[in-house]
């Protein structure tokens, strides 16, 4: 199984036992995937030997930031006014688009939403709506405009790139030295829909060109090209990208000192808000006592919180980060109940209790499951009450169903494992799109947007079902690419890679290539759904949902497992604990 915050590569190879609490002590075997017997129970249980949290409660509560208070706010406001003046005075089309791109990548475009919205609307109708306008543009202007406008919901057809090849189907000679234009073409191609063959071909040509250019370029353009080839911009997590881009942009010749100062100050001020959100979630986590009572499960609260920063780093999503951290932590614990500790009989009972959502039914459960259900029940009811008190509508029916569906999907995978059933790839993916936890997390996100009525919520949920499906599929497949080996070593069910190999006789590299092609195809479907959304509330939700897919790429990147664990810890430190301007 897998879910938000699943880090199988964090499994420790312990040399001595480690017990936290007395209810269900962790018993470590000499091997990572060993079978252990819980002495408090007569059942044979698996152990994943998860390592303790790297960040203690006291450490988290001790964190603080100096980037708060009136002085910071006043300086930020002064800088914002200067940037607004820059936006108003910029008359060159290419430079205007570059400025919008810089503001986005620096992570400060949210401060100028109105100005950027007005700019792009004017640019679209004056320059990109009709072919006779954009036919005269060079490749760079076409590609940058295409990417930004599609990103913001404007329809620009793929035919804008028809003439980048000559009559022999080769790259036009005048483009051979246009590295920036080819880089923007490459990034633009990832906003394509299914069956947009021009963009597919453009991506292939641009990728080949950029790889060949790596030995011929240097400086900031080399950094941008290398970064893009590692992971395309459209698939990157905004907060992670802004941290990287601030450092790159600062070294660029001609970079704006005003933009640099504002980006750094805003990053640190927003980070201070994130610290308070994390401290709030940490207090909730300690109050559940799950870290001491359910010691077979992972204590991944900080990593869970990092996921929520991926959903949205913006200051106005503070309540959302606090709520989704709770959701992610509960998902992680439930995942370990089903994946590692529970017997099949217990899991069937527990799933029934979750489905009934009846506190009286817990008498039939073992003690550890009573603790788990009580914690889930109380936390979900608290979240429901907060929404009722602040927004005036009852979300419990939606939330209960989402959690019940998650547990049912977990049970299906547990039954497959215990009964030795090998599902088809399609059977696996249908269930895995739920068990990956995307639907339950995104159901909570629905109620954290600016929706103002039950009717609006219901419409948004119906309208975005495909979005949830596509995001969850990307989530699942990237998880499989990044963690299948670790989970298989732990004794988990077969994943998409192994199932494709089993069904087709493919080698592992061939299977991985196929899964990557499925991810790319699903992104194209997601792009199409993003483009046809009309309501503002749905668009807000879709932005959050798309960021979940981006976080999956970030968290489950391929590579050595120990290396990835170190990378995640490094990002936790740089994104959450270390101000750009210094402590």
Swiss-Prot record:
Tissues in which the UniProt entry reports expression: Expressed in every aerial organ except for the stem stele of mature plants. Not detected in roots.
InterPro entries from the UniProt entry: Isoprenoid_synthase_dom_sf, Terpene_cyclase-like_1_C, Terpene_cyclase_plant_C1, Terpene_synth_N, Terpene_synth_N_sf, Terpene_synthase-like, Terpene_synthase_metal-bd, Terpenoid_cyclase/PrenylTrfase
Chief location category: plastid
Pathways involved: Secondary metabolite biosynthesis; terpenoid biosynthesis
PANTHER family, per the entry: OS04G0344100 PROTEIN-RELATED, TERPENE SYNTHASE 10
GO molecular function: magnesium ion binding; R-linalool synthase activity; terpene synthase activity
Transit peptide location on this chain: 1-40
Induction: By wounding.
Species in which this protein is naturally found: Artemisia annua
Protein name: R-linalool synthase QH5, chloroplastic
Residues that bind (2E)-geranyl diphosphate: 298, 335, 339, 476, 479
Catalytic activity: (2E)-geranyl diphosphate + H2O = (R)-linalool + diphosphate
GO CC terms, sorted: chloroplast
């Amino acid at each position: 199984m897998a879910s938000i915050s699943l880090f199988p590569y964090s499994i420790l190879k312990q040399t001595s036992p480690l017990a936290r609490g007395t209810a269900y002590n962790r018993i470590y075997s000499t091997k990572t995937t060993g079978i252990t017997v819980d002495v408090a129970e007569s059942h044979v249980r698996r152990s994943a030997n998860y390592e303790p949290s790297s960040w203690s409660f006291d450490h988290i509560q001790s964190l603080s930031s100096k980037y708060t208070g009136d002085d910071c706010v006043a300086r930020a406001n002064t800088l914002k006014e200067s940037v607004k003046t820059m936006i108003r005075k910029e008359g060159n089309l290419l430079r205007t688009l570059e400025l919008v791109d810089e503001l986005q990548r620096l992570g400060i475009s949210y401060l100028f939403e109105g100005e950027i919205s007005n700019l792009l609307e004017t640019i679209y109708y004056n320059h990109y709506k009709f072919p006779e306008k954009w036919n005269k543009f060079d490749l760079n202007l076409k590609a940058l405009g295409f990417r930004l406008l599609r990103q913001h919901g404007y329809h620009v057809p793929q035919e804008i790139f028809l003439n980048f090849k000559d009559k022999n189907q080769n790259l036009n000679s005048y483009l051979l030295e246009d590295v920036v234009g080819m880089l923007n073409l490459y990034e633009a191609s990832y906003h394509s829909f299914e069956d947009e063959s021009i963009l597919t071909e453009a991506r292939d040509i641009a990728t080949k060109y950029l790889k060949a250019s790596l030995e011929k370029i240097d400086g900031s353009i080399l950094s941008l090209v290398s970064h893009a080839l590692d992971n395309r911009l459209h698939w990157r997590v905004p907060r992670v990208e802004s941290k990287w881009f601030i450092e790159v942009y600062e070294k660029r010749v001609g970079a704006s000192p005003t933009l640099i100062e504002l980006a750094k100050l805003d990053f640190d001020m927003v980070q201070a808000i994130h610290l308070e959100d994390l401290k709030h979630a940490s207090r909730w986590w300690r109050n559940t006592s799950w870290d001491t009572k359910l010691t077979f499960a992972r204590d991944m609260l900080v990593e869970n919180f990092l996921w929520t920063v991926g959903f949205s780093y913006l200051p106005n999503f503070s309540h959302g980060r606090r709520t989704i951290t709770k959701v992610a932590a509960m998902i992680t614990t439930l995942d370990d109940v089903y994946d590692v500790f529970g017997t099949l009989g217990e899991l069937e009972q527990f799933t029934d209790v979750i489905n009934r959502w009846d506190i009286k039914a817990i008498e039939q459960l073992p003690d550890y499951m009573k603790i788990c259900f009580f914690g889930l029940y109380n936390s979900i009811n608290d979240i429901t009450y907060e929404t009722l008190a602040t927004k005036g509508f009852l979300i419990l029916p939606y939330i209960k169903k989402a959690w019940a569906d998650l547990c049912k999907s977990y049970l299906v995978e547990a039954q497959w494992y215990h009964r030795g059933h090998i599902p088809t790839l399609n059977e696996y993916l249908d269930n895995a799109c739920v068990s990956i936890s995307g639907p339950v997390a995104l159901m909570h996100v629905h109620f954290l947007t600016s929706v103002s009525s039950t009717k609006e919520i219901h419409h948004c949920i119906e309208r975005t079902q495909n979005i949830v499906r596509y995001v969850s599929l990307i989530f699942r497949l990237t998880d499989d690419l990044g963690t299948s080996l670790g989970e298989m070593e732990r004794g988990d069910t077969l994943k998409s890679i192994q199932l494709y190999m089993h069904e087709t006789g493919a080698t592992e590299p061939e299977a991985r290539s196929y899964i990557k092609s499925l991810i790319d195809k699903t992104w194209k479907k997601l792009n199409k759904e993003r483009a046809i959304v009309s309501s503002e509330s749905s668009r807000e939700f879709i932005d959050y949902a798309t960021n979940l897919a981006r976080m999956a790429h970030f968290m489950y990147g391929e590579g050595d497992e120990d290396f990835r664990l170190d990378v995640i810890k490094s990002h936790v430190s740089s994104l959450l604990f270390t101000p750009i301007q210094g402590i």
